[in-house]
Amino acid sequence: HSQQRLLREEVLSLTRQNGEYDMGKKKSKSIVAVVGRPNVGKSTLFNALAGENIAIVKDTPGITRDRIYADVSWLDRNFTLIDTGGIEPESKDIILSQMREQAQIAIDTADVIIFLVDVKQGLQDADSKVADMLRRSRKPVVLAVNKVDDFKKYMPDVYEFYNLGIGEPYPISATNRLGLGEFLDEVIAHFGQEVEEEEEDDRIRVAIIGKPNVGKSSIINRLIGENRLIVSDIAGTTRDAVDTEITHNGKEYVLIDTAGLRRKNKIKEELERYMIIRTVSAVERADIAVLIIGAVEGVTEQDAKIAGIAHDRGKAVIIAVNKWDAIEKDNQTVKEYTQKIRQVLSFMPYAEIMFISAVSGQRLMKLYDVIDAVNENHSMRVATGVLNEIVTEAVALQQPPSDKGKRLRIYYTTQVAVKPPTFVIFVNDKELMHFSYLRYLENQIRDTFGFVGTPLKFFVRERKDKK
């Protein structure tokens, strides 16, 4: 037992150093949006800050993504960086209207806004107009003056940007990564205290996500409408995903709605970007994502993009096929739909699938039961002794891989976090842990404990053989 305890402590200290998870305590992550005219270097800054952490480049199979958001860490503060930029327009009028649009998205969804300007182009009329908007929003704004690759030469030009009236301009060069430290210090200074959610907060936070026009609002209205016990619209939520508190069967839920403004004249690409930003903003604050898919259109690549946001962030996922009443059905229909969904969303085989109708109310209240079950799985802890029995049995059933005569040895497995359940497997040589064997172990653990609706995270750590 003492050896097991030592191993466990070793595992925990190793993984804490890596900061790869937060021991199951849910921290609310700040959202930082970048706004600026075309060609001031937004993408360069985005790449400089995000480094290798670009969530969008992560190879979740079956998904192509645009570089719209990324996870960034600075001085142990984690935040989600959003690039509000869109298509590069031609005329000055279009530039201004697009910048206003970007600024509005940032004001709607972000906690802190980075306003990026270009020292070489100097202060432009469009900069002043957008600065006015940002000032009125009362959101914290950090002004970054880009392309200052020679501080002595450009400092007089940097001071000109004080005229925008949004505080001190921070000189940076995104290309050469100059001045980023002080600038990032200022960004995270606006986060306030990093709030660890109170352990006693038993409310289940559910984001309702999906493409436009799949019936998200109707579903939320139904869920609220059948529950006359609406506690309140939570005050103080400044982001544009609207949170509503609900009590159902004595349990409390927070529904986070991403159903945004319908903008008829918007270009398709812009609508999609806007939808993704709103989804990131909502999913960040939820435990569970309910992905709504339209039954008539069926599952699409765009659904996969939205699902990928929840998957990358380790959220539990329920897939709800809405407008089920509008479909001609026979006894194969459910099976065919399920197969198609599993095929397009192949990266989340764990997700629960259900078929509902907001119009008729069909199976809509059952959604609460599924949310409860999935929430339980997302928060499940497995005792270390039991977990190691399962892994030992799995190893006996299927020998671990070997390379050049050296075989993988698994010493010990322990669960170190929940939401999602996170495990550390301690081995002699992590290079020997083949992806397919890890998948096999995951399947054995799932077969035993269920874990329906939630992703599982695994870290493989080395511990040199003491023999």
How should each PLM-predicted stretch be described?
Residues A207, Y368-M433, R439:
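Long, well-ordered amphipathic alpha-helical subdomains in the mid-to-C-terminal portions
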Residues E101-E168, I277-Y350:
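Conserved C-terminal guanine-recognition region of P-loop GTPase G domains, centered on the G4
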Residues P140-V142, D149-E199, A326-V382:
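Canonical P-loop GTPase G-domain recognition
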Residues I341, Y437-F451:
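Short, non-transmembrane amphipathic alpha-helical segments
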Residues Q4-R5, Y21:
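Cationic, low-complexity basic patches in intrinsically disordered or flexible, solvent-exposed regions
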